[in-house]
Amino acid sequence: MKTIGEFNAAHGPEAIGLTDLTAVHWNLEAPRLYEEALRRGEAQLARGGALVATTGSHTGRSPKDKVVVRDAGTENEIWWDNNGSITREQFATLLEDFRAHARGKELFAQDLYGGADPAHRVRARVYTELAWHSLFIRNLLIRPERGELAAYVPELTIIDLPSFQADPVRHGCRSKTVIAIDFAQKIVLIGGSAYAGEMKKSVFTYLNYVLPGAGVMPMHCSANAALDETGDSALFFGLSGTGKTTLSNDSSRKLIGDDEHGWSRDGIFNFEGGCYAKTIRLSRNAEPEIYATTERFGTVMENVVIDPLTRVPDFDDATLTENTRCAYPLDFIANASATGRAGHPKNIVMLTCDAFGVMPPIARLTGAEAMYHFLSGYTAKVAGTERGLTAPEATFSTCFGAPFMPRHPSVYGNLLRALMAEHGVDCWLVNTGWTGGGVGTGRRMPIRVTRRLLSAALDGSLAQTEFRRDPYFGFSVPVEVAGVETQVLSPVETWTNKAAFAETATRLVTMFRENFKRFESHVDADVRAAEPVAAPIAA
C-alpha cells in the first residue's frame, strides 16, 4: 500500500480493518486535493478558484437511511422514536462489506478535530473515496497543526464510500443508501450517497450523544459575538435553510460559527472550523461575506450550476437542487473568531421559517416559553435540504435539529433551560418565513427587517420597548421598532383577508398542541402552560 502525506503510522488504516488498499492520501491540503479531484474528473474549476462538484441523485441528507446500533449500551440511551436501528450483527456485516468494497481502492484520509474546546473535542478521522469529499471535510472540521499529525490517534472513524450499495436484507437498512453509527466502536459508515453534508452531520450526531453526559449542551445553532470589549455572544437556533448562516454572518459582529456549537461551564465553542452555506439565489449585495467565499481558491461548491464555457456560477439556477451549497474554512470570513470560542451568551435567537405566515417577525420568550418552543422546534423544511423535498413543508423538528439528536429531546431541553437561568439569557423567537400570507400567497420576510430586529435585540434596545401579548401564541411582541414598518410587527395586519388569517392561525395553534402532547409528561407545569391557545386570548 502506497502512503502519501503525514500521519501516525502506528495508527494506520489497518487499525480499523482497511487492508489491501492501493494507496492512502493522508491529510492533503487544498492544492493537492484540487489536483486529484480534477485529474479524476470528480469536479470542475469555477472562475474565481472554487472547486465545483455534483452529488448525483442525493442532493440532500437522507435522514430515513440513518441507523444506530441497538444493543444493551444504547437501548435506554437513544430516542428510538426518532432514530432507526440495526443490530450489532448487522453492523458487523456492514462493516466487513465496507472493508471488502474498499480493497484495491485509493482512499483519502483527514485527521481532524470536532470541537474548538480541547476539553470537549473529538478526534475524528475521515476516510473518503472522493478527493473533493476530503477537501470538504477538511474545510468543515478543525485542522490540527502539522506537528500534531505524527502523534494523532483517532477516537471517531468515519468511512465514506459513495460507490458502496447497501443491501437492505443483508444489512438491516432501508435502501441502498446507509448512514450507520456504532457509538460503542465509535465508527460511522456512509454508503450510497455522495452528499458531503452526511459526513459533518455524523460528527455532530456523535457529539450530541457524548457531550450531555459531561454537562455540555450540544446545539444546532450558529453563533456570533460583539466586537467590543464586552464580547457579548448570541446563539441562533434553526433548522437547515432558516437563516442561521446568513444571520450570524454580520460584519458588525465576530462570527464564532455557522451551524454546530457546544455550551459548557466555560462558555460556548464551535464544533467546526468551517461553514456550509446555502447558495441558492446568493446575492453579492445581500450576503457579501458569503458571496466572497465563492470566488476563492479552497472553497468547495456543491451542486452549483456553472457556465460550461466561462465557468461562472449561476446561483439562481436550481436545475440540480434548491440545496446548492458552498463549504469553506472559517478564516475565509474576515471577522471570524480565530479561537472558535466565546463567553456565555447574552441572547438566544430561535429561528422559525413559518410557512403559514401567521407568526410575528420577532417575539420575546420567557424561560418556560423558550423551552416550549425549543422542544416544539416549529419551522418549515426548506426545499432541497432533504432528498425528495421540493417545496416548503410545515414541520416540528424538536431542538431545531431532530435528525441529529440521538437522545430524548428533554435531555437537551433541560440542559438549555438550566444554562439560560444560570446565566440570565434573553430569548427571542424570530420568523424568517412568510408574511402577508402563507406559501403561495404571502412573501418571505425581508432580510433587512430581520437584520434590523436582530440588531435591536442584540444591542439591548428591543428589550426596553413596549410589548403586546400575541392573541394566539401568548408571547410578547414589540409594538414599535425604529426602522421597521409597524404593520409588519402585527401579522394579521399584513393579511388582506382577516378571517383567513384567524382560521390559519387557529390551525397552526392546533398543530402545536397536538405535537407537544408527546412532551407533556417530560416538562414542568409552567412549560405546559406556555403552549398556544386554540381560541385567541385577550391581547
Swiss-Prot record:
Record flagged with keyword Cytoplasm: yes
Single Gene Ontology MF annotation: phosphoenolpyruvate carboxykinase (ATP) activity
Its job: Involved in the gluconeogenesis. Catalyzes the conversion of oxaloacetate (OAA) to phosphoenolpyruvate (PEP) through direct phosphoryl transfer between the nucleoside triphosphate and OAA.
Keyword Lyase: yes
GO biological process terms held by the UniProt record: gluconeogenesis
Localization terms from the record: Cytoplasm
Catalytic activity: oxaloacetate + ATP = phosphoenolpyruvate + ADP + CO2
A family per Pfam: PEPCK_ATP
HAMAP family found in the cross-reference section: PEPCK_ATP (MF_00453)
Predominant cellular place of this UniProt entry's protein: cytoplasm
Enzyme Commission number(s) from the entry: 4.1.1.49
Cofactor dependence: Mn(2+)
Binding site for substrate: R61, Y195, K201, R325
Free-text cofactor note: Binds 1 Mn(2+) ion per subunit.
Annotated binding of Mn(2+), by residue: K201, H220, D259
Similarity remark: Belongs to the phosphoenolpyruvate carboxykinase (ATP) family.
Protein name: Phosphoenolpyruvate carboxykinase (ATP)
Pathway: Carbohydrate biosynthesis; gluconeogenesis
Record gene name: pckA
Positions of ATP binding: K201, H220, G238, L239, S240, G241, T242, G243, K244, T245, T246, E287, R325, T450
Keywords on record: ATP-binding, Cytoplasm, Decarboxylase, Gluconeogenesis, Lyase, Manganese, Metal-binding, Nucleotide-binding
PANTHER family, alphabetized: PHOSPHOENOLPYRUVATE CARBOXYKINASE (ATP), PHOSPHOENOLPYRUVATE CARBOXYKINASE ATP
Signal sequence, renumbered to the chain: none
